[in-house]
Amino acid sequence: MRTLLGVSLCALAVASFAVPFSPSLAQAGISTNPAPLETTGYSSAVEALSKYEVDSSRLALTRSQTQATRAFAQQMIDHHGRVKSDQKAVGGPDAGSALEGPLSEMLNSLENVPSAEFNAAYKRGQIAAHEEALKVHGAYAARGSELAERAKAQAAMPVIQKHLDAAHNLPSA
């Protein structure tokens, strides 16, 4: 399962930063195929994507000069912080470890992108991560191995869609 996640996130990283953003990226199969249906794989994928969204958003707060980008980044940090606190309160997993593999590479690329290109790269990464999160949650909600987790996955989808819609509206410059 870890290998499948690594391979799919590698494809996500390559597509996200090697290709200029276009609406067809989401249709190009850059995400996990198939999405994990066992709880462990699902949880690992969700934790990794969430960590990328937060870490890249912290970077956006220091690198972006655009108010809309900074506001979105703060929203991501705040929302994911609340979710993480809620998970800890009910004994959920802690995603405190460093990013690995493709998501780490995506974050490193974002750290090193020239300032003039930062907003566009951040936008691409957020769109890719949220599209992947929607796919992972949707697949698990439909066919996941644990009913309680399936309900949580389903409940998360409208929030992820809202974040994805907001990411699409971020400025590229």
In which residue ranges do the predicted regions lie?
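His/Met- and acidic-residue-enriched segments that coordinate or traffic transition-metal cofactors
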Residues: 2-12, 16-173
